[in-house]
Amino acid sequence: NIPLMVQGASVNWHWFYPAFDVSFKNNDELIKAGRKYNAVGYINSGWTDDPQTLMRLSWPDMAYGSIASWQSEPINQLAFFQKYTKIIYPAALAATVEKAHLALMRSESFIRKAVGQTDFALWEDPFSVKSLQMYEKNKENLHKGRLAAEEAQIYLRDALKSGIDTTSLFAMLVGAKELDLLALKYLYAGNIAEMHKKYSKKRDLKEFRMIMGEVTAYYHSKTVDMYDAIVETKEMFRKAWLNEYTPFRLGIPMAKFDMELQYWFKISKRLNTLAWNYKDNEELPNLQSLLQRQ
């Protein structure tokens, strides 16, 4: 008889904000199997193979697995964050942090339904045929996911004013910003694709140039929004990373943010040619050929 240990894991290795609804269920099922086969213990684990991972975001997973392994029945997942935050934070702060956790969990779930593994989706081509098909089927999931991410940011910025556990709360804020950026990227790309389709055959040039101004204008356009969101998220991620780790490997995610920024510079430049280089009855080029990511 060889002693058996069961090991669970936070679902964080391809998800920059953990998929708690998945990992909580995984914990329950693994613990159930461990009891069935008389396991002598349960191990929690988190993974940092992916350089986008902030381990502080997985702390609720660590707590859930540790608690669940000592219970005779599965934990009430709906009540978990209420109890978790009451133990960690003062009463005046706990409810706000609980709301932030729940909003983040909703945001991650909605966005994951749309894009799958969020780490990869953050850097993929939003104008590919595959991405635009995803957008068409998931507009509501992306929209709801972004709203929930923004809701979480409101709670977290309020909680950070307390000066309590600011390192963990800031990591959560970075997770919310990344979810916000991810949803924004695909919503904007889908909106641009819809605009391109509407005007692809012929167009009133005055109207078309005004619409294109909302996409590429120097001030307050969609592409400028993307520049700002990428740069802000990058610098926040850098700070959160250095709160947890040494600078080793930090250059990898930083380079990815830089590549994403350069990509949107290119998108803006190429889209701007549509407004001025084509006559009113001249067909616009195929969107994928115009904006292909290299």
Name every feature range the model reports, one short phrase each.
Residues N1-Q294:
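Substrate-binding groove of N-acetylhexosamine-processing glycoside hydrolases
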